[in-house]
UniProtKB/Swiss-Prot annotation:
GO terms for biological process: iron-sulfur cluster assembly. Keywords: Iron, Iron-sulfur, Metal-binding. Pfam families: Fe-S_biosyn (PF01521). InterPro entries: FeS_biogenesis, FeS_cluster_insertion, FeS_cluster_insertion_CS, FeS_cluster_insertion_RrpA, HesB-like_dom_sf. This is Iron-sulfur cluster insertion protein ErpA. The keyword RNA-binding does not apply. Iron-sulfur cluster binds at C41, C105, C107. NCBIfam families: iron-sulfur cluster assembly accessory protein, PRK13623.1. It comes from Photobacterium profundum (strain SS9). Binds 1 iron-sulfur cluster per subunit. Belongs to the HesB/IscA family. Required for insertion of 4Fe-4S clusters for at least IspG. Its cofactor is iron-sulfur cluster. SUPFAM superfamilies: HesB-like domain.
């Protein structure tokens, strides 16, 4: 699949951090799963977890030999977004740069559409 057809991007910085974390866990089957749940101060919130499974209907995006997984329900809120990683004074975290979000909370962990 070419990048032009992928509805969600996985940044090099995020992929490299995932690669490091997988190496630390010594489990090459791990993949980063991004998902959306109800809650947070803006209505929806992003979640990230490591998962060994890819479920029916999940989309996978690969970068630098690691895989990002997203379920179809979450994907509809993430189309056009970029999963990225940052380290700063507020700590380190994965985040989504989401063009569909009409409002976001101050920390960027929740959003509304």
């Amino acid at each position: 699949m070419s990048d032009a057809n992928v509805p969600l991007s996985f940044s090099d910085v995020a992929a490299n951090k995932v690669k490091t974390l997988i190496a630390e866990e010594e489990n090459p089957e791990l993949k980063l799963r991004v998902y959306i749940t109800g809650g947070g101060c803006s209505g929806f919130q992003y979640g990230f977890t490591f998962d060994e499974k890819v479920n029916d209907g999940d989309m996978t995006i690969e970068n630098s030999g690691v895989t990002l997984v997203v379920d179809p329900m979450s994907l509809q809120y993430l189309v056009g977004g970029i999963v990225d990683y940052t380290e700063g004074l507020e700590g380190s975290r994965f985040f989504v740069n989401n063009p569909n979000a009409t409002t976001t909370c101050g920390c960027g962990a929740s959003f509304s559409v």
